[in-house]
């Protein structure tokens, strides 16, 4: 079979803005306004209006905007509203870890039966959704928890539940996500208590002897999250001793700089912690630190990530020999990977990270939930034809009911899922060092920010991306203002074009960079971006020569009829689950999902012109603005394939391991429908190829 596309990851680090790829002058506009294509914006200055890295930290190409700057719309707002009305918004009524009775986060002595990572895991997303949607109930609840944590800080600066490990060392892991909650709260409220709170805590951390600092498994792996908060505070206060603490954290965190190994292979740790060297690179300026993060990403995917969807197989840990697309990843892992991608996009300016963030967000993350976001599952795989409460080990690493959609189970993911979409929204637009704006993750909505010489503008974005290739922007400004607008061109996109007020602007836009429009903008100016989407077949040579099918940023899965069977959420849960005694179980059922149609098909693919093997069918946009379901999918593909009788559910109750392609089968040719992977709760996304 002819090779269709190489899949081994091979990329280089982009350190500086690339040369101008195209240059033109806008017709009818004076002062030589320009349109250029660059690999990334220059970072020789600092944004005048939004908090950027202070020296000696590396200058940033992109700067995160305040929470209040971005208002999501369209499908993205719909996901947040579903979360608000679903498990995220009501987990405080369900989870025993969020009870306000005997909770160590609420007690001055910081002791209680309940109190560890669960509260901050949930609150960092719950609170941010409250800020973005301006939901009064959620805002009030968020403030309750934030006030309690601040008020219970100890005189020496320590805070949070007192948890000691067997060797008597204080476990600091749970404080790390709580610091992120504090940062978001400060961005929203400007409550000065937060800066004092964090400064006192970091002075306390700095005084801990190294042999007692970040020694336990979780905190040792995840020290980079602590470092993010240290730099956040440094950029607001400029206190130099904070840089000493960052160095201390780096020295005591697990070694994520190994050339051909990782300190551990836990899926969430890898997705969350591989960025630690790149975080410290901002201070060290050592190119090896930045390279280590890229190498970690490449390593895990070359071994366990030769699958579609942007993630890798580690259920819960990656294991030698378990690299088939039936291997799954935690919902936590998806959230942390997207978060890492967003951080790395800011600090490196490399569009590679935006591409991977979209891959996870569009093709993997939505499928971890029921369509109403009232239940989720712990593990999701690219090839997954049963989602039930049975024990599927050792086919997956974990023992227990890890595949069912259950609002009462999946303790860590049950809480940590909350931040996925809202962090995505917060990073959809970013400020630039030259006082411009960059649109990074296309979705409907609006951004309000200061640009140019301090003029506050609002840009409204209209699009059905990633289900449509056109993105329209309208600029609202009180007076004319000159600033650069950066439009990201994804790596999959060839032939991107842009127009201003209906006039096409010539620019040689290449995949993986930015169109930079510098103009003297006036109120009502319109910019239209087109990102032509094409069919592409990707071959996974290292995974049995299987293939996946992309259309633009979307990967497609076989449309499998899904039979949802409602079950009691309390009858089959993971061993560490817990719920409040008065949680209304009738409102929060669990679901097993079984295939109600055949799934064991291989695709017929034209090896010379693989894209000709599929037909794109475009459908109406869903009235409820939720495209991530099979029924609502705005795009489908029509393909042809054959059934493979020997490819069945195996002895562990899982989708069987892929057969090696090409597969010979005497079955008849069958018309197949493929749907976007992110809306398919049961899915075959890595297909065998049949002859």
Describe each region flagged by the PLM:
Residues 122, 136-173, 304-312:
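Helix-terminus loop motifs that line ligand-binding clefts
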Residues 209, 213-257, 262-263:
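Solenoidal tandem-repeat scaffolds enriched in leucines and small polar residues
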Residues 483-486, 517-534:
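C-terminal beta-strand-rich structural cap/linker in extracellular carbohydrate-active enzymes
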């Amino acid at each position: 079979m002819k090779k269709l596309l190489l899949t081994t990851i091979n990329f280089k680090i982009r350190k500086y803005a690339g040369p101008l790829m195209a240059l033109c002058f806008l017709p009818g506009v004076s002062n030589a306004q320009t349109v250029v294509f660059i690999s990334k914006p220059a970072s020789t200055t600092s944004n005048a209006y939004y908090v950027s890295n202070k020296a000696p930290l590396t200058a940033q190409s992109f700067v995160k905007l305040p929470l209040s700057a971005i208002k999501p719309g369209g499908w993205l707002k719909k996901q947040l509203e579903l979360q608000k009305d679903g498990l995220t918004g009501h987990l405080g009524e369900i989870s025993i870890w969020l009870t306000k009775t005997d909770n160590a986060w609420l007690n001055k002595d910081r002791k209680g039966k309940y109190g560890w990572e669960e509260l901050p895991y949930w609150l960092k997303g719950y609170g941010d959704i409250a800020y973005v949607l301006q939901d009064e109930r959620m805002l009030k609840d968020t403030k309750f928890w934030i006030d309690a944590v601040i008020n219970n800080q100890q005189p020496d600066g320590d805070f949070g539940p007192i948890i000691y490990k067997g060797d008597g060392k204080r476990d600091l892991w749970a404080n790390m996500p709580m610091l992120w909650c504090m940062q978001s709260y400060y961005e929203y409220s400007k409550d000065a208590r937060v800066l004092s709170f964090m400064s006192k805590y970091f002075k306390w951390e700095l005084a801990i002897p190294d042999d007692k600092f970040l020694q336990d498994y979780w905190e040792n792996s995840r020290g980079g999250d602590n470092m993010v908060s240290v730099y956040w505070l440094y950029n607001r206060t400029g206190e130099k001793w904070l840089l000493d603490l960052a160095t201390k954290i780096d020295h005591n965190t697990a070694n994520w700089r190994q050339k051909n190994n990782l300190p551990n292979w836990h899926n969430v740790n890898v997705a969350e912690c591989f960025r630690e060297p790149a975080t410290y690179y901002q201070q060290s300026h050592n190119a090896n630190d930045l390279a280590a993060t890229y190498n970690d990403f490449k390593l895990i995917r070359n071994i366990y990530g030769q699958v579609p969807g942007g993630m890798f197989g580690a259920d819960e840990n990656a294991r030698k020999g378990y690299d088939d697309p039936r291997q799954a990843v935690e919902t936590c892992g998806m959230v942390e990977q997207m978060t890492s991608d967003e951080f790395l996009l800011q600090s490196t300016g490399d569009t590679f990270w935006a591409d991977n963030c979209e891959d996870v967000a569009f093709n993997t993350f939505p499928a971890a939930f029921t369509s109403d976001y009232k239940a989720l599952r712990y593990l999701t795989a690219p090839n997954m034809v049963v989602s039930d409460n049975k024990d599927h080990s050792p086919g997956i690493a974990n023992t227990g009911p890890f595949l069912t959609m259950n609002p009462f189970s999946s303790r860590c993911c049950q809480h940590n899922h909350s931040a996925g979409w809202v962090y995505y929204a917060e990073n959809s637009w970013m400020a630039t060092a030259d006082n411009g704006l960059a649109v990074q993750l296309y979705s409907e909505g609006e951004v309000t920010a200061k640009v140019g010489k301090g003029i506050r503008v609002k840009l409204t974005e209209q699009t059905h991306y990633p289900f449509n290739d056109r993105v329209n922007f309208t600029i609202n400004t009180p007076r004319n203002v000159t600033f650069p607008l950066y439009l990201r061109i994804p790596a999959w996109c060839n032939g991107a074009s842009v127009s201003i007020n209906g006039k096409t602007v010539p620019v040689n836009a290449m995949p993986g960079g930015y169109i930079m429009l510098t103009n003297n903008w006036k109120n009502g100016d319109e910019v239209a971006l087109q990102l032509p989407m094409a069919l592409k077949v990707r071959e996974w040579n290292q995974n049995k020569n299987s293939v996946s099918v992309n259309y633009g940023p979307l990967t497609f899965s076989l449309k499998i009829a899904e039979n949802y069977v409602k079950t009691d959420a309390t009858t089959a849960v993971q061993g560490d689950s817990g719920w409040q005694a008065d949680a209304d179980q009738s409102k929060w059922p669990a679901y097993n999902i079984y295939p109600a149609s055949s799934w064991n098909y291989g695709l017929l693919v034209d090896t010379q012109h693989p894209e000709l093997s599929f037909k794109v069918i475009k459908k109406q946009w869903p009235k409820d603005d939720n495209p991530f379901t099979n029924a609502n999918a705005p795009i489908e593909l029509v393909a042809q394939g054959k059934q493979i009788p020997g490819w069945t559910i195996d002895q562990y109750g899982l989708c069987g391991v892929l057969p090696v392609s090409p597969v010979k089968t005497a079955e008849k040719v069958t018309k197949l429908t493929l749907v976007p992977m992110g809306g398919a709760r049961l899915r075959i996304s890595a297909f065998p190829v049949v002859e």
